[in-house]
Amino acid sequence: ITSQLGVLMRYCIRTVTWRFKESIELDPEFVNKRSVVIRSPSDVFENYQSLFKDQVRERFVVLWLNSANKVIGFEIITEGLLNSSLTHPREVFRGAIVSTSASIILAHNHPSGNPEPSQEDISITKQIVESGKIIGIPVHDHIIFADNNFTSLAERGLV
């Protein structure tokens, strides 16, 4: 079992490292964003809007935070269809666990330009929040990006 656990940990570390490098390549300003302290939904919007700019498909991203709410990394979990981005809690928390995140923030875009959360958005958020409670990694917010606007599900009492 010990050797199997070692293999699994090496796989997870390689996967997170690959995703992390992929994220940096997508956003060359990431080095500056890694030290961002998140105090409000607008901090997320201002610092990570470039991940969603000009996207024609939904993109679902998870920000990993330390105990001081400083971003220690992020991962693009899925890129979906024109109006949906399917994701599962295990994908959301895999990188957060390996990176020893204290908490996470979810973010995705609506290419339609409408920042209102859909029923699917609310449902998956609730599912991920409950999963986070079970494993001890709280979800602070779910931000929906749309053009030059955003909606915080936490501000609406949905997180």
Residue ranges and their predicted role:
Residues 16-76:
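Long amphipathic N-terminal alpha/beta scaffold segment
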Residues 1-26, 46, 66-68, 78, ...:
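Active-site-proximal loop/helix of nucleotide/amide-processing enzymes and allied scaffolds
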